[in-house]
């Protein structure tokens, strides 16, 4: 008794509240001290005590017990304020979407975390006996997260994909949620429910597959005798100490470990906690341990390679079914973890970085050479320090020194005044946080339609031009210049050229348009949109659909017609200096039966044109005939223009014939059917007989028309013609009959005939004499063609205000291809072209260049945005001016009509040359938009963008400016002109006298720009020319002077700013044309704040900005699309790749584990592979070039891939706070990686190619046969591995039963019943269990000579193991030289 009393007196009395962790420690020490049975009694007493106390307390829970944290209100308000500022920055283009999302998540996460930390102290101070507090913080019911949702705020939720919903729930469950919050909360809660249902089954299936792979692995031997192991080093800092201890405890050493000369641990010794601590204190060299990877037995495992059993802490017993234990211990946490998510209901968890705060107020100083500027994750500017940085803070009387660790971000500038507790630096959340990060792609989509522009920081380098992936070298902006692209199936190519003014509602109407020429210019002019100076637009926007696509340009009405179909081939076909541009005329769009015709541009072979040469011709389909016939010019006077031998091609038949090209107003075509037959053929009809339609003429020929037959026999062939028409037998008095071959105009009656009918159409009278006495008259129908004379294209080009002489003239002439009365023969079914529309080239006879008799022409290929365009360049030889006309303009042709006539003449050349210069008449009365054509994604058709009045805003004082009165007067005089013409944002101004203006002009020619800039400075008055702007890229080249870009600019897209008059000198320095301006940048001292956009016009007192939206992109982001491409709303602009923390539940983890175990690829390949290769093992160079290096390389690859698989799976589980011993994973990974694929048929024919065999089996077979077997290692997924086991019964019970059994039967496979499953299926005794010693053979002792090495590292250790393992193989296959010194060479290699 006394002894007991004395012992009691010695016991230490702890007066402490015991919590969960303390309880765990107590239990483990009790077990160590007393053993299992005794401990369980002690714990029973503790349990009883607990129940008694709880009954006495009798806790009840009411809603009043949920106390809200008082500081919540201002915390939430603060967070909202920060979010607002952030939104503004994003709008101005200072941060991009990823940074914004990341920062807003961190703001709310930090708020939520802060509330959670306040919770415990709050309860402790206000109400320590609060039942909620007692229950949750003792761990009896509920955890901190749930209580936080009840009394703090619910915070951020995840959606079912595990992504963040960036709208936080600010209320807690005690206050109640608003409707929006409730819906978001349901979203998160649903995720919890779904996960519980779905993921539980997933986890179960995972467990089943895992067990299937490893069910046959049992401990069968004590020692397999391997000399290999895996090196684990505490030194390399990659592995935290905790994980290092976990890895080592319970393993067996593969090698002796020395501390200097002393051996502190021997081979095959198992490692306990004491030994591990000694390793850590001594910082010993890498420790080589045995793992299941290195075990040499094929289908089981030995005790030493497995290590200690987790149940009782001694070496594992023989007959233990370690495989099944491994499978279950990996699968089981999955089910547990899914259940855990259910209760928290999808609340997001993330991580925040640690901050360094200033200790007191003062000025901060640091060495600026040690830091370099960078951006933080949230887009704030900061300094990155690469080494330890000492920061001093000087307050009035003391200096504070703060040490900032490397890789941290410094958030303040040098010499800045900081206040106490201000955040001055952010420590990078390093490897210490076990958050599982992953790379995510985030696409940024465009908010509006428009045209894409990059800042000059994106490379326009040639190698990037053709790909659609543009990597950003540094942080820069992408701009979307606003404008409305018109989507349509027909590409609207027409006479609209770049910078034409046109209707903004132009293309929104119907698809097919008819020309309606009744609208006169005055009507059209009144209907145009007008707005007064203050920027208000009229209430009524007129409907333009009745204008029917008419543009009033000077004296022509240009009718807009959709010409080209988008499928037609835009690139021309090229035949020997001849280009054909495909073209559809209007009629073809309606019936689409006629074959395609095109404009052909012909250049003489030597490339030299004389005067009046034909440059191009167009075969008009209206003048095309299928049948043969005769052309008559009638009474019209003809004059021959050019007579030249020309080569005509009709379906490959080439004939030289003189081509009479006559210029006539009207001609007649008399159709006839002609058959040319060989002389020997028999004809079934008589000469001068009359036949009907479809009469048989010869054996295989029938007539197409009815009429009179004429047969003429030539030398070797017979010509048979059939004339259609009426036959008259006139009386003798009939005068008309004496003439043959006469054209009679309509309106003349026939004399002396019984019916005095008037002739309605032209007819052709022909006298036919079948015999000497009889004759009759054949009246044949005539097709009449009117040719209107072509328009001289010179009228399309107004005189150039720049007084540059434009020498080249082009005019259009229609020529008839056949002479008067010439018979025209069609060859088989080809159609015959009667009239050809030609473009005749001429030039002025200048006094200076009068000697210029010839012009050189050539095709120029220009490549823009991947589409090749051809330009035709005509050079007057002695004249310095070169003229570039637009040739393969996909716009085909437009319709031009004479002013008064109602007959439209197809003029295919109008569009080809209508944009030769970047200038258009001043008098164009402008509707409201400017066109821009852009290339589409598919690079075939163009799309237009209309910039119209919807994007225009003007600001600024009008009262100060005096000379506007001139404008107002002129407007009163001529009320038809809309006000916006007077000072339109599109740069056109009325030619008002002394209108004081200084436009900066942007034209195609840089030279002109400089001249005008000088004029500006001289403040001269001049007439404003319509502007065309350009942009410069980073090389200073002018980007995109291509006249074929069309966006319809809409005045609402243009912002018009008025500045004070005296501001001109300063402005010109700050604002340059084409410059992009972010929102809220003030250009004047008291000027208006600007909207973001691009400056397209600078004037004395105002600038015009085309509104644009900036998007920020950081380095490494991928830009989609091309410079200047049209984008629609919702198109992808940029893709960011960023890292984010996974949300805190296994939902994301389990699929990850499964992905690794099924060996699916996880990571996307990074764009810069060079960086990956740099990080490879430095020792790799030592392997290369050694005779057996390839073998070592292969071994190392297998070992390395196994280790990295294990690490990947461990990462997922550790991030969930689940501890699984590595050896379980190793057993499974060993099974996945232990099969090889036989790749070549060796001489021995042991294995067939493509067969999967065990790795060890292949090695043994190679040694036995003394010849190499070629194989490659494959990573099988767990499903495939369980279908490729030794036993077909276990395979069949897993999946595809019928197939597996049928195959096994055909192959005659034998099942040795080594595993558990087979025996369970067949009802036998399972060959496992620690009592089952029957199958175990005493292990053979291998007398191996370990190689003595003192200095080792990971690489040498593995190298030695591999060499040792393959020693016999080397001895057999290495050459004689190696035979003499094998032992020394190994040792030398290791000592190096």
From Swiss-Prot:
Keyword terms of this UniProt record: Chloroplast, DNA-directed RNA polymerase, Metal-binding, Nucleotidyltransferase, Plastid, Transcription, Transferase, Zinc
GO MF annotation terms: DNA binding; DNA-directed RNA polymerase activity; zinc ion binding
Cofactor: Zn(2+)
Subcellular compartments: Plastid, Chloroplast
Binding site for Zn(2+): 224, 295, 302, 305
Record-level GO BP terms: DNA-templated transcription
InterPro entries per the UniProt record, alphabetical: DNA-dir_RpoC2_beta_pp, RNA_pol_beta''_euk, RNA_pol_Rpb1_3_sf, RNA_pol_Rpb1_4, RNA_pol_Rpb1_5, Rpb1_funnel_sf
Catalytic reactions on record: RNA(n) + a ribonucleoside 5'-triphosphate = RNA(n+1) + diphosphate
Keyword Nucleotidyltransferase: yes
GO cellular component: chloroplast; DNA-directed RNA polymerase complex; mitochondrion
Keyword Magnesium attributed: no
Alphabetized Pfam families for the sequence: RNA_pol_Rpb1_4 (PF05000), RNA_pol_Rpb1_5 (PF04998)
Cofactor: binding details: Binds 1 Zn(2+) ion per subunit.
EC identifiers of the protein: 2.7.7.6
HAMAP family found in the cross-reference section: RNApol_bact_RpoC2 (MF_01324)
Homology family: Belongs to the RNA polymerase beta' chain family. RpoC2 subfamily.
Quaternary context: In plastids the minimal PEP RNA polymerase catalytic core is composed of four subunits: alpha, beta, beta', and beta''. When a (nuclear-encoded) sigma factor is associated with the core the holoenzyme is formed, which can initiate transcription.
Protein name, entry field: DNA-directed RNA polymerase subunit beta''
Organism: Nicotiana tabacum
Gene (UniProt): rpoC2
């Amino acid at each position: 008794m006394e002894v007991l009393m004395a012992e009691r007196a010695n016991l230490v009395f702890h007066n402490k509240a015991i919590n969960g962790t303390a309880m765990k420690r107590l239990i483990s020490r009790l077990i160590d001290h007393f053993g299992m049975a005794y401990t369980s009694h002690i714990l029973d007493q503790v349990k009883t005590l607990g129940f008694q106390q709880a009954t006495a307390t009798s806790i009840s829970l009411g809603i009043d017990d949920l106390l809200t944290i008082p500081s919540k209100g201002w915390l939430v308000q603060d967070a909202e304020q920060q979010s607002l500022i952030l939104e503004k920055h994003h709008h101005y283009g200072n941060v991009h979407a990823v940074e914004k999302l990341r920062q807003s998540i961190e703001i709310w996460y930090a708020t939520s975390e802060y509330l959670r930390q306040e919770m415990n102290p709050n309860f402790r101070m206000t109400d320590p006996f609060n039942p909620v507090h007692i229950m949750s913080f003792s761990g009896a019911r509920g955890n901190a997260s749930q209580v936080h949702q009840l009394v703090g705020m619910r915070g951020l939720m995840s959606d079912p994909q595990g992504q963040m919903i960036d709208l936080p729930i600010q209320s807690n469950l005690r206050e109640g949620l608003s409707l929006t919050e409730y819906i978001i909360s349901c979203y998160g809660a649903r995720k919890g429910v779904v996960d519980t249902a779905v993921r539980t089954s997933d986890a179960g299936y995972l467990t089943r597959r895992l067990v299937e792979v490893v069910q046959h692995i049992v401990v069968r031997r004590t020692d397999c005798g391997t000399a290999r192991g895996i090196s684990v080093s505490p030194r390399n800092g990659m592995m935290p100490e905790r994980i290092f201890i976990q890895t080592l405890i319970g393993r067996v050493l593969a090698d002796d470990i020395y501390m200097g000369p002393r051996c502190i641990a021997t081979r095959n010794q198992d490692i306990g906690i004491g030994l591990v601590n000694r390793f850590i204190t001594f910082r010993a060299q890498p420790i080589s341990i045995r793992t299941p990877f290195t075990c040499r037995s094929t289908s089981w495992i030995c005790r030493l390679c497995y290590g200690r059993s987790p149940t009782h802490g001694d070496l594992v017993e023989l007959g233990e079914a370690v495989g099944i234990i491994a499978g279950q211990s990996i699968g089981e946490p999955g089910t547990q973890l899914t259940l855990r998510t259910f209760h928290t209901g999808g609340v997001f968890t993330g991580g925040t970085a640690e901050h360094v705060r200033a200790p007191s107020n003062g000025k901060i100083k640091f060495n600026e050479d040690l830091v370099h500027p960078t951006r933080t994750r949230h887009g704030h500017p900061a300094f990155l320090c690469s080494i330890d940085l000492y920061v001093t803070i000087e307050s009035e009387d003391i200096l504070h020194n703060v040490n900032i660790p490397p890789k941290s971000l410094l958030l303040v500038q040098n010499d800045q005044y900081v206040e106490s507790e201000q955040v001055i630096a952010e420590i990078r959340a390093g490897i210490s946080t076990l958050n599982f990060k992953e790379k995510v792609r985030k696409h940024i989509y465009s908010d509006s339609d428009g045209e894409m522009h990059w800042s000059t920081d994106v490379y326009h380098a040639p190698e990037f031009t053709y790909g659609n992936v543009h990597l950003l070298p540094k942080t820069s902006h992408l701009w979307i210049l606003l404008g409305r692209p018109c989507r349509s199936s027909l590409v609207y190519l027409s006479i609209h050229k770049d910078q034409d003014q046109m209707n903004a509602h132009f293309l929104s109407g119907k698809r097919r348009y008819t020309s309606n020429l009744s609208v006169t210019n005055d009507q059209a002019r009144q209907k145009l949109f007008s707005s007064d100076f203050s920027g208000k637009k009229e209430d009524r926007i007129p409907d333009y659909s009745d204008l029917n696509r008419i543009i009033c340009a000077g004296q022509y009405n240009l009718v807009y017609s959709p010409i080209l179909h988008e499928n037609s081939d835009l690139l021309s076909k090229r035949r020997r200096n001849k280009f054909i541009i495909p073209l559809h005329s209007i009629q073809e769009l309606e019936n689409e039966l006629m074959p395609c015709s095109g404009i052909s541009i012909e250049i003489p072979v030597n490339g030299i044109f004389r005067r009046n040469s034909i440059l191009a011709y167009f075969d008009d389909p209206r003048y095309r005939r299928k049948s043969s016939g005769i052309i008559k010019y009638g009474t019209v006077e003809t004059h021959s223009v050019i007579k030249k031998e020309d080569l005509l091609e009709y379906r490959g038949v080439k004939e030289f014939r003189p081509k009479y090209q006559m210029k006539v107003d009207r001609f007649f075509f008399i159709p006839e059917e002609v058959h040319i037959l060989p002389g020997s053929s028999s004809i079934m009809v008589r000469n001068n007989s009359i036949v009907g339609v479809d009469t048989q003429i010869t054996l295989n020929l029938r007539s197409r028309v009815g009429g009179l037959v004429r047969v003429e026999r030539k030398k070797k062939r017979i010509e048979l013609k059939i004339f259609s028409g009426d036959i008259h037998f006139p009386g003798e008095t009939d005068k008309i009959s004496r003439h043959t071959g006469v054209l009679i105009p309509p309106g003349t009656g026939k004399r002396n005939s019984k019916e005095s009918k008037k002739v309605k159409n032209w007819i052709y009278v022909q006298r036919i004499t079948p015999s000497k006495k009889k004759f009759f008259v054949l009246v044949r129908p005539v097709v009449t063609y009117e040719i209107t004379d072509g328009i001289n294209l010179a009228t399309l080009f107004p005189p150039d205000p720049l007084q540059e002489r434009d020498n080249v003239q082009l005019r259009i002439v229609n020529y008839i291809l056949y002479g008067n009365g010439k018979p025209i023969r069609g060859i088989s079914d080809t159609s015959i072209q009667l009239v050809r529309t030609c473009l005749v080239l001429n030039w002025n006879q200048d006094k200076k260049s009068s000697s210029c008799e010839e012009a050189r022409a050539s095709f120029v290929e220009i490549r823009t945005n991947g589409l090749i365009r051809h330009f035709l360049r005509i050079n007057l030889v002695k004249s310095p001016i070169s003229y570039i006309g637009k040739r393969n303009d996909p716009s085909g042709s437009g319709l031009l009509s004479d002013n008064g006539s109602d007959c439209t003449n197809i003029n295919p050349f109008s569009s080809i040359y209508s944009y030769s210069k970047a200038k258009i008449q001043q008098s164009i009365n402008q509707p409201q938009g400017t066109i821009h054509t852009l290339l589409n994604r598919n690079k075939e058709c163009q799309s237009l963008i209309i910039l119209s009045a919807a994007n225009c805003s003007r600001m600024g004082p009008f009262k100060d400016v005096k000379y506007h009165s001139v404008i107002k007067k002129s407007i009163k005089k001529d009320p038809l002109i809309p006000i916006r013409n007077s000072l339109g944002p599109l740069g056109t101004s009325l030619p008002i006298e002394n209108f004081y203006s200084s436009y900066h002009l942007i034209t195609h020619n840089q030279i002109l720009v400089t001249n005008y800039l000088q004029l500006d400075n001289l403040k001269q008055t001049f007439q404003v020319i319509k502007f065309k702007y350009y942009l410069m890229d980073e090389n200073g080249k002018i980007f995109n002077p291509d006249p074929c870009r069309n966006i319809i600019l809409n005045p609402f897209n243009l912002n018009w700013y008025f500045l004070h008059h005296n501001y001109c000198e300063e402005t010109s320095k700050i604002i340059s044309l084409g410059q992009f301006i972010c929102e809220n940048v003030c250009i004047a001292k008291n000027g208006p704040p600007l909207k973001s956009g691009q400056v397209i016009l600078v004037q004395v007192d105002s600038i015009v900005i085309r509104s644009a939206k900036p998007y920020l992109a950081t380095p490494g982001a991928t830009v989609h699309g091309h410079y200047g491409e049209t984008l629609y709303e919702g198109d992808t602009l940029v893709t960011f790749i960023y890292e984010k923390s996974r949300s805190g539940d296994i939902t994301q983890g389990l699929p990850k584990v499964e992905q690794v175990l099924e060996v699916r690829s996880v990571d996307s390949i990074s764009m810069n592979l060079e960086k990956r290769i740099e990080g490879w093992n430095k020792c790799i160079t030592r392997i290369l070039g050694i005779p057996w290096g390839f073998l070592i390389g292969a071994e190392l690859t297998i070992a390395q891939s196994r280790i990295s698989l294990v690490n990947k799976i461990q990462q997922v589980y550790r991030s969930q706070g689940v501890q699984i011993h590595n050896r379980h994973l190793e057993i499974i990974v060993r099974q996945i990686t232990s099969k090889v694929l036989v790749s070549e048929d060796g001489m021995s024919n042991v294995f067939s190619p493509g067969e999967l065999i065990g790795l060890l089996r292949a090695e043994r077979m190679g040694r036995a046969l003394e010849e190499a077997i070629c194989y490659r290692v494959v990573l099988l997924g767990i499903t495939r591995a369980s279908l490729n086991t030794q036993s077909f019964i276990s395979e069949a019970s897993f999946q595809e039963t019928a197939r597996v059994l049928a195959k096994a039967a055909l192959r005659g496979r034998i099942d040795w019943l080594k595993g558990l499953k087979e025996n369970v299926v067949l009802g036998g005794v399972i060959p496992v269990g620690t009592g089952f010693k029957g199958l175990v053979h005493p292990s053979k002792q291998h007398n191996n000579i370990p190689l003595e090495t003192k200095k080792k590292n990971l690489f040498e250790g593995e190298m030695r193991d591999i060499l040792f393992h393959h020693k016999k193989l080397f001895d057999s296959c290495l050459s004689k030289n190696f035979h003499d010194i094998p032992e020394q060479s190994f040792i030398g290699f290791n000592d190096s």
